[in-house]
C-alpha cells in the first residue's frame, strides 16, 4: 500500500510541467519587471542597464500618442 501511495505521489510530481530556467537565460525579466535581458536591444527598445548575465536590459519605447491622450 505504501508503494502505491509513493508511486502515485511520484507520478503526480512528474505530471506537473515545472519550468526549468537558467539564471543566465535570455529574455529574463529585469528593470523591476518592466524590461527584458537581451544580447542586443531591438530597434523599438532602449537600453536601461545590464542584467546579471552581462546582457543589456532593454525597455520598450513608449508610444507618444498613448502618453498625450486626454479624456473628453
Curated annotation (Swiss-Prot):
Q: What induces it?
A: Antimicrobial activity is decreased when the sodium chloride concentration is increased.
> Could you say which tissues express the protein in this record?
High expression in the testis. Gastric antrum exhibited relatively high levels. A lower expression is observed in uterus and neutrophils thyroid gland, lung, and kidney. No detectable expression in other tissues tested.
The record's GO molecular-function terms, alphabetically, read: chemoattractant activity
According to its UniProt entry, one GO biological process term is: monocyte chemotaxis
Q: Name one GO cellular component term.
A: extracellular region
Subcellular location(s): the record lists: Secreted
Q: Establish whether keyword 4Fe-4S is in the entry.
A: no
Signal peptide residues on this chain, from the entry's feature table: 1-22
Annotated S-S bridges: 30-57, 37-51, 41-58
**Record carries keyword Disulfide bond:** yes
Q: Identify the keywords attached in UniProt to this record, alphabetized.
A: Antibiotic, Antimicrobial, Defensin, Disulfide bond, Secreted, Signal
- Function comment: Has antimicrobial activity. Synergistic effects with lysozyme and DEFB103.
Can you tell me which family this protein belongs to? Belongs to the beta-defensin family.
Protein name, entry field: Beta-defensin 104
Which gene is transcribed and translated to give this protein?
A: DEFB104A
